[in-house]
């Protein structure tokens, strides 16, 4: 895993867009983002049990598996959105980027590779893309039946209870740190 501030320069979303300014795991944790490196699937199983995750599936994002739909899917994943459930992804193969909004609404890019696991809290704005190799295989973990329901960023989402709870948690973390 490598995290850094996104450079916001125009260009292909699948390029690194590395500003040269690193972001620490502690900062990610302050956003509610949890990172782990799990070389063994048994570690993922233990985390799933601990967090009450009963279901999982695997998705391979590549032109070979998605055909003509690939470019549209990657664009859809890259649209800024949130979920009302936390999102857990375990990278089985390949590489990709999760971008999450920092405390000042700036993008933090998180590069994930094989055996990396990330947990994004409910209510955090984020987006995803493959890297320029156009291939990633990820396990998706779910507490209930597998579902992936993105809520694309819009002003009315400021009133979403999951978004409000997330922002309240950020405020509480900031106050506790001072």
Curated annotation (Swiss-Prot):
Protein's name in the database: Acireductone dioxygenase
- In the UniProt record, the gene name given for this protein reads adi1
Upper classification of the source organism reads: Eukaryota, Fungi, Dikarya, Ascomycota, Pezizomycotina
* Required cofactor(s): Fe(2+); Ni(2+)
**What is the similarity comment for this entry?**
Belongs to the acireductone dioxygenase (ARD) family.
Source organism per UniProt: Emericella nidulans (strain FGSC A4 / ATCC 38163 / CBS 112.46 / NRRL 194 / M139)
- Provide this UniProt record's keywords sorted from A to Z: Amino-acid biosynthesis, Cytoplasm, Dioxygenase, Iron, Metal-binding, Methionine biosynthesis, Nickel, Nucleus, Oxidoreductase
Q: Name one GO molecular function term.
A: acireductone dioxygenase [iron(II)-requiring] activity
Q: Which GO terms describe its cellular component?
A: cytoplasm; nucleus
Which HAMAP family does the protein's record reference? Salvage_MtnD_euk
């Amino acid at each position: 895993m490598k995290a850094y501030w996104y450079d916001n320069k125009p260009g292909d979303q699948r390029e690194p867009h590395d500003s040269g300014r690193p972001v620490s795991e502690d900062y990610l944790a302050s956003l509610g983002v949890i990172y782990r490196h799990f070389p063994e699937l048994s570690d993922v199983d233990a985390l799933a049990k601990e967090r009450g995750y009963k279901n999982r599936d695997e998705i391979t994002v590549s032109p070979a598996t998605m055909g003509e739909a690939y470019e549209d899917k990657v664009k859809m994943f890259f649209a800024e959105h949130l979920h009302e459930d936390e999102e857990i992804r375990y990278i089985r193969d390949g590489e990709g980027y999760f971008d999450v909004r920092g405390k000042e609404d700036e993008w933090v890019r998180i590069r994930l590779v094989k055996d990396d696991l990330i947990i994004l809290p409910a209510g955090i704005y984020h987006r995803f893309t493959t890297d320029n190799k156009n291939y990633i295989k990820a396990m998706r973990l779910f507490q209930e039946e597998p579902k992936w329901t993105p809520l694309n960023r819009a002003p009315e989402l400021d009133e979403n209870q999951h978004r409000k709870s997330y922002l309240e948690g950020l405020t509480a973390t900031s106050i506790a740190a001072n």
